Amino acid sequence: MKIKVGILGASGYAGNELVRILLNHPKVEISYLGSSSSVGQNYQDLYPNTPLNLCFENKNLDELELDLLFLATPHKFSAKLLNENLLKKMKIIDLSADFRLKNPKDYELWYKFTHPNQELLQNAVYGLCELYKEEIKKASLVANPGCYTTCSILSLYPLFKEKIIDFSSVIIDAKSGVSGAGRSAKVENLFCEVNENIKAYNLALHRHTPEIEEHLSYAAKEKITLQFTPHLVPMQRGILISAYANLKEDLQEQDIRDIYTKYYQNNKFIRLLPPQSLPQTRWVKSSNFADINFSVDQRTKRVIVLGAIDNLIKGAAGQAVQNMNLMFDFDEDEGLKFFANL
């Protein structure tokens, strides 16, 4: 028997990827597409490549008969929309940032709004499947992690958990394709602005910073402050992070490989690459995999960690489906058994 799901925000890039994945999921029926601006428009007219013969509607959510609702909506939308009564009727996976951070003051600092739903904020489960699997299985509201966040946390988590690095030395240099900025038209994302160009943005201000710090702090069991700098690169999709940290003791590469293996050997979507094989975005493109590898610089006594994901899949829609699978006791990789399209 299939579960019935709905999607708000299916017209965006992450929303379209969600539709594409769910159409190939054997245990899911997409029965509702919500929109306030595209009511009556058939989804195939918007995305001719996607064979979903369903029109956008604008119904009161309390009227819907769904098992699960995905929210691929802008920030600040779901914080006002969700309530306990709705969560009694259906499970929710929110792809926005509205329920990712536990401290309401972080929303005032980083997102410039006062969170209106602080009780639900405390009850939401952070949907990083490899870290919080058991909590996700029991959750009614899952906050799907950000794309940079997913790649950064997964790449560094074992080092923080084992406390083998100087936490104050951590620097994350991240690069993302343009789809990470969303589908809305912006001058800075026009072809002539991004083609043959690489640029940093939101220095010391990127909103994924507190998310990364919060969950690496949980791993380290102490407050973490790190440096995160994102860059926009001229490609459609993909994230590559290069992270640097000072080692606290003299460790060899095999020592660190043993640590990563300890934490990730049983995870279906994390690939610890062989020595000397460094992650590339094309190896994870259109897949739900996270590729990780590292090198120890004996000269500087630093570990250099590389991580790569597809920002729209493992960084958004694929991870949302992975969360859904856990919430409904499906196989974790159900509907996600696809590899990179080189």
Curated annotation (Swiss-Prot):
Its EC number is 1.2.1.38. GO terms for molecular function: N-acetyl-gamma-glutamyl-phosphate reductase activity; NAD binding; NADP+ binding. It catalyses: N-acetyl-L-glutamate 5-semialdehyde + phosphate + NADP(+) = N-acetyl-L-glutamyl 5-phosphate + NADPH + H(+). InterPro entries: AGPR_AS, AGPR_type-1, NAD(P)-bd_dom_sf, NAGSA_dehydrogenase, Semialdehyde_DH_NAD-bd. It is an enzyme of class 1 (oxidoreductase). The active site is at 147. The keyword Cytoplasm applies. Pfam families: Semialdhyde_dh, Semialdhyde_dhC_1. It is found in: Cytoplasm. PROSITE patterns: ARGC. GO terms for cellular component: cytoplasm. Pathway: Amino-acid biosynthesis; L-arginine biosynthesis; N(2)-acetyl-L-ornithine from L-glutamate: step 3/4. GO terms for biological process: L-arginine biosynthetic process. Keywords: Amino-acid biosynthesis, Arginine biosynthesis, Cytoplasm, NADP, Oxidoreductase. NCBIfam families: argC. Catalyzes the NADPH-dependent reduction of N-acetyl-5-glutamyl phosphate to yield N-acetyl-L-glutamate 5-semialdehyde. Belongs to the NAGSA dehydrogenase family. Type 1 subfamily. HAMAP family: ArgC_type1. PANTHER family: N-ACETYL-GAMMA-GLUTAMYL-PHOSPHATE REDUCTASE, CHLOROPLASTIC-RELATED, N-ACETYL-GAMMA-GLUTAMYL-PHOSPHATE REDUCTASE, CHLOROPLASTIC-RELATED-RELATED. This is N-acetyl-gamma-glutamyl-phosphate reductase.
